[in-house]
Every structure is written in structure tokens, then in C-alpha cells.
């Protein structure tokens, strides 16, 4: 809930700046058309099913709010630094994720800090139950937690790979320590971070994979990552609660004991793959996204939640907006490296919705 209020506050700041100074390029507004199909499908599903659950209408407004909030932040940072470019903004994002990761570690080490930080934000019933049930079993983020934290930490790893390939790294040692820190803490918060790590690794290896210069440069960085990662993993095995370590690396521990590359989470995910039994659900959905204290149909799989809510139309239209953002961005930036980044991020989003 606190994220929503902060987003609204930043959005109001962005709207105010736009009205006063009109610093937003009006051509960017065209991406909002990508929100219209999913909003219309949401209205149709809510009315036809008589549930009046217009989740994706509110989603559309939240994306517009994020749009203005993002421009407000870009404007503020741009005023403080001359020649502020995309790489600078991506660095700011990475630093914020690093600070969030540090805060998650400190909240685990100091329970009083955890209690204080969570006392100043409001959670819904489902989030509150998840925080209570997992306390002491895994690290908990603040503002960004669980699956959401895994997504953000994974995205930070992908963006850091872009910065490395774009030669925007000054102190490689410090940069690598931050990369490993975000990776390890991200895994301790949500194992979904591993997906982002795999995408960042794929991005790194696929870029100019035949170029001798880049092969040497990438191998040196990967070696450095491995050395620091070994130190980081050794630290958490020595100094963190065994329950947290067992949870974070459960999949690898099971694999080592011939139980397969699985965990309680992946086993539960398999159980969540339930499919609609009626044609009506495939066409217009059931018009429900969340219930009071659990997910509709007890599934947290992204594609299935979209399918049960608004049928195939919502499941397809949901991805029109990110596609239009990427299309508009590609028209602005011609860098092959950046184009590859957008492709990786879009593929990352598609894969995450299987979870």
C-alpha cells in the first residue's frame, strides 16, 4: 500500500512539472494506447461476469502514474547532473536496488529494525500473512518483497551487464562486489532472482561472442564474479541462520542429494498449473483476479491468473503495453547493445509469467 501512495505522490509531482514546464515529449503519450485494450477487456469481463472487478482499469491508471513519476525522477536527476544520460539513470536504479538489499540484510540481522520498518507501511491481509509466515526463514525486503523483489534484483543484474558491456564501469572491483551482493541477497529474499541472473549471463555471453577482445574481457569479469561469489556464499554459510541458507539453496542441496533440481516452491508451482474447464472462461474469464485472502483459483502463475480473470483476450492484451514501450524506445535509441537489452528484458517478462 505504501508503494501505491509513494507512486501517487511522485506522479503528482510529474504532472505538476509537466503543467508548469512541459518537459515531457508529447509523443511519449502514444504508448498509453497500449493500455486501452487490456482496460476495455477488464471492463467487459467485470460486467459480463457480474463481478465488477476492474483490476486492469486500475492497472492502466497505475501505469500512467508510473509514467509521470518516472519523468519526475528523470527531471530531478537531470537537473543535478549535466549530460545525464540513460546509463546514469540505470546506475541510479542499480544503486537503489543495492540499498534495498542492504536494508533487507540489516532488517534480518536486527529484528528491532525489521519491526520498526514494517510498522510504518501498510500491508494487505495476504501480504501481512506472508510476512508473518516467512519471518526468520528468508530475508524480507522493504517496499519490494518476495516475488517482486526477485524480479527487481534480477532486472538490476541484467542492467549491470548492460553497463559492463557498454563500458560504463569505472571501478570494476566495486561494481562486481555490488553485482554479487545484489545476486546473493536477492536469492535470500526470493529465489526468482536466479532467473534474472541466468538472463544476465546469457546477455553477457551472447554479445559479440566471436570477438577475441570481448571474449577475454568477459572471461576476466566472470572469473572475478566467481571469486567474489565464493567469498559471499562462504560468508552466508558461516554467519547466517542455517534455516535461511537451507531455504535459499534448497534446490541445489536437493540436487546434490539426488533429489533432483527441485524445491518446495517448484513443487507447489506445479500444483498451481490448473486450467479452465469451461469455454466461457477462455473467452471472457471469470472476472476475478484476487479474493480476500488468496489468489483466485489458488494459482499464482502469471499467465493463468490473466486467463482466469479475463480469458485469452486479457492474457494477450496485457503484453501490448510493454511491447509498445519497447517499440517506441527502439525508435529513439539505435544502439545494437541497447536493442539487445530491450529484447532480453521483454523475454525476461514473458518467462517470469510462467511463475
Indicate where each model-derived feature is located.
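Hydrophobic transmembrane alpha-helices and their immediate junctions
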Residues: 169-171, 198-210, 309-353
Amino acid at each position: 500500500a505504501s508503494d501505491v501512495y509513494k507512486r501517487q505522490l511522485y506522479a503528482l509531482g510529474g504532472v505538476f512539472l509537466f503543467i508548469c514546464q512541459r518537459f515531457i515529449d508529447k509523443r511519449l503519450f502514444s504508448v498509453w494506447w497500449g493500455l486501452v485494450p487490456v482496460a476495455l477487456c477488464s471492463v467487459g469481463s467485470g460486467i459480463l461476469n457480474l463481478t465488477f472487478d476492474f483490476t486492469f482499469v486500475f492497472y492502466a491508471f497505475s501505469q500512467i502514474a508510473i509514467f509521470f513519476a518516472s519523468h519526475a525522477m528523470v527531471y530531478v536527476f537531470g537537473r543535478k547532473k549535466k549530460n545525464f544520460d540513460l546509463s546514469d539513470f540505470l546506475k541510479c536504479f542499480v544503486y537503489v536496488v543495492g540499498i534495498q538489499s542492504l536494508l533487507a540484510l540489516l532488517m534480518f540481522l536486527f529484528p528491532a529494525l525489521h519491526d520498526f520498518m514494517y510498522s510504518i507501511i501498510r500491508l494487505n491481509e495476504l501480504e501481512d500473512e506472508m510476512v508473518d509466515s516467512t519471518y526468520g526463514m528468508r530475508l524480507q525486503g522493504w517496499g519490494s518483497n518476495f516475488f517482486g523483489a526477485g524480479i527487481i534484483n534480477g532486472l538490476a543484474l541484467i542492467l549491470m551487464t548492460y553497463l559492463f558491456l557498454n563500458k560504463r564501469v569505472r571501478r570494476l572491483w566495486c561494481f562486481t562486489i555490488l553485482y554479487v551482493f545484489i545476486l546473493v541477497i536477492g536469492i535470500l529474499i526470493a529465489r526468482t532472482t536466479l532467473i534474472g541472473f541466468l538472463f544476465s549471463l546469457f546477455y553477457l555471453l551472447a554479445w559479440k561472442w566471436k570477438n577475441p577482445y570481448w571474449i577475454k574481457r568477459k572471461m576476466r569479469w566472470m572469473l572475478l564474479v566467481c571469486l567474489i561469489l565464493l567469498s559471499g556464499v562462504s560468508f552466508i554459510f558461516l554467519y547466517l541462520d542455517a534455516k535461511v541458507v537451507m531455504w535459499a539453496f534448497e534446490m541445489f542441496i536437493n540436487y546434490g542429494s539426488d533429489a533432483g533440481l527441485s524445491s518446495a516452491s517448484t513443487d507447489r508451482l506445479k500444483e498451481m498449473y490448473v486450467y479452465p474447464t469451461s469455454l466461457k472462461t477462455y473467452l471472457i474469464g471469470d472476472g476475478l483476479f484476487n479474493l480476500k485472502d488468496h489468489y483466485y483459483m489458488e494459482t499464482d502463475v502469471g499467465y493463468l491468473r490473466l486467463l482466469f480473470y479475463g480469458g485469452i483476450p486479457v492474457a494477450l492484451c496485457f503484453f501490448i503495453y510493454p511491447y509498445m514501450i519497447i517499440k517506441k524506445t527502439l525508435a529513439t535509441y539505435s544502439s545494437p547493445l541497447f536493442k539487445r537489452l530491450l529484447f532480453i528484458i521483454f523475454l525476461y517478462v514473458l518467462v517470469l509469467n510462467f511463475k
